[in-house]
Amino acid sequence: MSTHNDSAPTSRRRHIVRLVVFAGFLVGMFYLVAATDVIDVAAVRGAVSATGPAAPLTYVVVSAVLGALFVPGPILAASSGLLFGPLVGVFVTLGATVGTAVVASLVGRRAGRASARALLGGERADRTDALIERCGLWAVVGQRFVPGISDAFASYAFGTFGVPLWQMAVGAFIGSAPRAFAYTALGAAIGDRSPLLASCAIAVWCVTAIIGAFAARHGYRQWRAHARGDGADGGVEDPDREVGAR
C-alpha cells in the first residue's frame, strides 16, 4: 500500500521535471538565437538566392526551421519581401509560418504531451481535449493576432496540450495572414524604397495590433467568467446528498 502511495508523487515529480526541462531548453534556445544573433540571416538570404528558381521553396523550408528555432518572425518575413517582393513574398512567408507551427507543435507534442495529460489527470485531460476539439482552431487564430507573444513558443505550448496538426496549420495560415503581409511588404518596401508600400504595411500592422489587443481582452474576460462559473458550481451543495445525510 505504501509503495503504491509513494509511486504517485514520484511519477508526478517526474512529469513536472520533464516539463520544466523542456521549458528551460526552449528558453535557453530563445536566448541563444533571438538575443545573441547567433544565426546570420543575411548569410541565409545569400544562400537561398544562390538556389535560383528553387529559392522560394528553399526559403519556405529554411525559414520554417529557423522560425522553430526562435529566429524572429518579422525578420524572416522582411527577408522574404526583400528576396521575392511583396506578392510572392507573402505566400512564401505564409508557407514558412505554417511550417514553423507544424514543426514546433510536433516537437511540443512529442516532448510534453504525455506529461501534461498526466499532470491534468484523466478527467480534466479529457475535458481539455474536448475543448481543444471545439475551440483549438480559433485559439491558434486568436493567438496570432495578439501582439508580443512568440508564435514559436505558442506553437510548442499548443503541441504540448495536443492541438491537432490541421488546426495548427489552418489557424497559423488564417491568423498570420495580416502580419505576414505587413512584415513582408515592409521588407519589400525597404528593398524597393517604396513609401506607399511601407505606409500600407504599417497601417495593416497597426490595425492587426488593435484587433489583437481587443481579442486578448475579450478572451481574458471570458476566461475569468468561466473560472468564476466553475467556482460557483463547485460551491453548490448537492440537495440529495444533504437529505441523505439527515
Curated annotation (Swiss-Prot):
UniProt-listed Pfam families: VTT_dom (PF09335)
Family named by the database record: Belongs to the TVP38/TMEM64 family.
Predominant location category: membrane
Taxonomic lineage of the native organism: Bacteria, Bacillati, Actinomycetota, Actinomycetes, Mycobacteriales
Name assigned to this protein: TVP38/TMEM64 family membrane protein Rv0625c
Entry membrane topology: Multi-pass membrane protein
Compartment annotation: Cell membrane
Keywords linked to the UniProt accession: Acetylation, Cell membrane, Membrane, Transmembrane, Transmembrane helix
Transmembrane portions of the chain: 19-39, 57-77, 83-103, 157-177, 196-216
GO annotations of cellular component type: plasma membrane
Residues with N-acetylserine modification: 2
